[in-house]
């Protein structure tokens, strides 16, 4: 909707509409309206001239009020308190505009605008026989009122929206405060729980520290004891090594003596060879017989082992079988080792005797040849 602008000028759109709606007045109507508007202008001018000065009116009012001061003496105390309040607001009141003066100025400006409008209408009637300025003013005023209504409606809607937003904001604040209270309660509970956990952790840490300290001390004592035992074992091993060295030296000396004695006794091996060979063969035969008996005993032990194995549980069967097999292998290896040692000893002795016997025969043959010569 088009209205009057801030400078008091009528917009071109309203002027165009007023021109379209304004009709030509009849001479009689024009004269009648002209006389009415002229009288109105004269009365407005007279009102402007008869207007009383505000200062004079204020002076007269002051005189009339002075006559009533005696009646208000009894209310002096009340007025003094009010006066103190007014004195406190004096600085603010000084800076406020004079509402009466402002209203009078507004009336004067409206009167001048009306005079100008009526003058324009008179000129328009005299020239064109129309009241177009008056129509334009009325239409502009209606447009301004419509714009004002729309503005007021928008303001109401805006105010309602603001009120609703404020209510929503208030509810949101209340909801937020309620949530914050709940969160504070939860935070307080969590703080209490954290405090309890810290206390429990401190107690547990102290207990674990003492426990670890005691365990470490016990472990150090055990390690110290084990170290002392190992040192003792090391001393014993060192003594055994020294003893072994002494024994080895003694054995070496003994072997050297044996070698010397064997060198001295090598001449006697030829005569002793046959007897030793027979004795070794006899011992070998005895070993074979013993081996055969051992095989028979071994078979019996295996049969007995199988019979006992069937009567035991599966778990004990495996353990017993491994143990007896280990014992059997150890016994057999021992027997074999013993037999191998005996056979090797016999075989070495046999070879030595053969060597010695061969040397003796060669010596005997050489002696016989010499005798023949």
Curated annotation (Swiss-Prot):
It is found in: Cytoplasm, Cytoskeleton, Flagellum axoneme. It holds the Pfam family IQ. Residues 145-200 form a coiled coil. GO terms for cellular component: axoneme; motile cilium. Disulfide bonds: none annotated. Component of the nexin-dynein regulatory complex (N-DRC). PANTHER family: DYNEIN REGULATORY COMPLEX PROTEIN 9 (PTHR14871:SF1). Component of the nexin-dynein regulatory complex (N-DRC), a key regulator of ciliary/flagellar motility which maintains the alignment and integrity of the distal axoneme and regulates microtubule sliding in motile axonemes. This is Dynein regulatory complex protein 9. It comes from Chlamydomonas reinhardtii (Chlamydomonas smithii). The lineage of its organism: Eukaryota, Viridiplantae, Chlorophyta, core chlorophytes, Chlorophyceae.
């Amino acid at each position: 909707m088009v209205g009057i602008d801030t400078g008091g000028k009528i917009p071109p759109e309203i002027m165009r509409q007023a021109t379209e709606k304004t009709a030509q007045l009849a001479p009689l109507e024009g004269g009648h309206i002209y006389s009415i508007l002229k009288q109105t202008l004269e009365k407005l001018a007279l009102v402007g001239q008869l207007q009383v000065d505000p200062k004079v009116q204020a002076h007269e009012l002051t005189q009339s009020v002075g006559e009533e001061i005696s009646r208000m003496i009894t209310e002096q105390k009340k007025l003094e308190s009010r006066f103190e309040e007014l004195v406190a607001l004096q600085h603010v009141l000084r800076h406020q505009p004079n509402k009466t003066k402002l209203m009078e100025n507004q009336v004067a400006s409206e009167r001048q605008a009306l005079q100008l409008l009526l003058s324009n209408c008179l000129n328009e009637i005299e020239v064109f026989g129309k009241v177009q300025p008056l129509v334009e003013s009325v239409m502009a005023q209606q447009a301004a009122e419509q714009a004002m209504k729309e503005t007021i409606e928008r303001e109401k809607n805006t105010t309602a929206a603001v009120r609703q937003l404020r209510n929503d904001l208030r509810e949101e604040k209340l909801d937020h405060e309620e949530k914050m209270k709940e969160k504070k309660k939860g935070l307080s509970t969590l703080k209490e729980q954290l405090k309890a956990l810290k206390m429990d952790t401190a107690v547990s840490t102290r207990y674990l520290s003492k426990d670890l300290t005691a365990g470490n001390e016990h472990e150090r004592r055990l390690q110290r004891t084990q170290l002392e035992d190992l040192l003792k074992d090391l001393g014993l091993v060192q003594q055994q090594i020294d003893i072994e060295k002494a024994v080895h030296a003694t054995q070496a000396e003994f072997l050297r003596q044996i070698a010397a004695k064997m060198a001295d006794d090598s001449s006697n091996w030829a005569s002793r060879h046959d007897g030793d060979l027979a004795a070794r063969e006899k011992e070998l035969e005895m070993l074979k017989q013993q081996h055969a008996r051992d095989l028979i005993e071994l078979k019996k032990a295996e049969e007995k082992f199988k019979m006992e194995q069937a009567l035991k549980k599966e778990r004990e069967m495996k353990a017993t079988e491994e143990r007896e097999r280990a014992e059997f292998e150890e016994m057999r290896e021992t027997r074999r080792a013993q037999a191998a040692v005996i056979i090797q000893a016999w075989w070495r002795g046999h070879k030595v005797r053969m060597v010695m016997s061969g040397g003796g025969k060669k010596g005997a043959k050489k002696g016989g040849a010499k005798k023949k010569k």
